[in-house]
Each structure stands twice: as structure tokens, then as C-alpha cells.
Amino acid sequence: MHDHSLHSGHDHGLGPGSFHDRGAPHARGDLRRRAFTVGVGGPVGSGKTALVLALCRALRDSRSLGVVTNDIFTREDAEFLVRNDALPAERIRAVETGGCPHAAIREDVTANLLALEELTEAHRPEILFCESGGDNLAAHFSRELADYTIYVIDVAGGDKVPRKGGPGITQADLLVVNKTDLATAVGADLDVMARDAARMRGDGPVVFAQVTRGVGVPEIAGHVLHAYRHAVGAPH
């Protein structure tokens, strides 16, 4: 019986963190219980749900997929994905986290684990996406929940966001800087963002994207597939 009471504490919630201290992905022997899981996190409005939709569209013809979304008090993100035909409705589940969305992906992952395991049992997906509720830069997925993590920030917050650090920015397996088309409008310098992201993440990968326009999506999907193949021991 899997212990759903696993808690990861706040060990990575203090300080900016670093990419090489992130708790690297590890081979997990129970992929039949819970399929390879990609955690998608980031602040409110950064484009997490749009990215999940884009990745479903990019991968659904070649891979069996499922999605679990997290919202504080609604099922809005799951309903958006169903409405936009990301996947058949039965492959999309919603978890209502209450007022503390980061706890559901880090301190007490019980509800998300159950939803992911139920999807795995019902549909035998190869890849699951777990989208967190919108939260701050300190929120980051527990490795008990996500085998691979993507953190989404957007240019609308200004070019200062990457250098603020926080575990999401420094320790996600992939950082996505979304909405690059807004840079001029908000006075953000993409070169500054690229430099600061590299400084905060070392050699951790960063993709600059316009998710709703498809820009950067193939590259992001490529990172996901590479991690999946590595996890299942398939040739890259």
C-alpha cells in the first residue's frame, strides 16, 4: 500500500535555491501505479493551463495522456481543458485545494496522488500532467508527486522575475518564460531575463515561449519526451 501521508516539509521553500540542489529526477519503479508525471507550476496568469493544453495537443497523437488540475475553490482549469478538447473529458480530473495551493503539491500531496493513480488505473496513460494552482515563486512540486517539473513565468511581470529566484525558478527541471510578445509593451528586456535566468539556474534549461501561438511548444514537448524516455529506459 502506498503511503499517501508523505510530507516533504519546507526544506526547499527557504532561499532562492539552486538547480543542482533541486533533487534530481530519479527512476521510479511504480509507473504502472502512477504514470510518469510532469508537474506544471507557476504564478497566477503565467500560462500554465495554456501550456498544458498546448502540450496535450502536441503529444496526444503519439502518447497516451492524462491531466490533473488544481484550483483553489473551482474546477475552472479542468473545464477550460475539456472545453478546448485537450483530451477526452474522462482523462481530465480536477482537485480543489482550498486556500493553500502549494500544500497540495508539496506538503500534503494526497489528493493529487489519488487523482493521478485513479487516472493511471482507468486509462493506462504514459504521461500525466499535474497543473498546480497559481502560487508564488516559493511554490515547487515534491518529487513524491512529480517526476519532471516545469515552472512557467511570464514577461508581463517584468524582467526582474528570473533574478528574484525561488525554488520554482531555480529548481524546476525546465523554466518557461512565456508571453515574450508582451516584452515591448511592458518594457521588459528579454536579454536581461535570459542572462538572469542563466545566472539563477546555471546550465538548467530555459525556453522562451509564446504558448498560445505555439512558439516554443515543440521544444518544451521535446524536453518532456526526453525525460519520459529516460524514466522508462527507452532510447532517446
From Swiss-Prot:
It is found in: Cytoplasm. The keyword Phosphoprotein does not apply. GO terms for cellular component: cytoplasm. Residues 1-26 are annotated as: Disordered. The keyword Chaperone applies. Keywords: Chaperone, Cytoplasm, GTP-binding, Nickel insertion, Nucleotide-binding. HAMAP family: UreG (MF_01389). Homodimer. UreD, UreF and UreG form a complex that acts as a GTP-hydrolysis-dependent molecular chaperone, activating the urease apoprotein by helping to assemble the nickel containing metallocenter of UreC. The UreE protein probably delivers the nickel. Belongs to the SIMIBI class G3E GTPase family. UreG subfamily. This is Urease accessory protein UreG. It comes from Anaeromyxobacter sp. (strain Fw109-5). The gene is ureG.
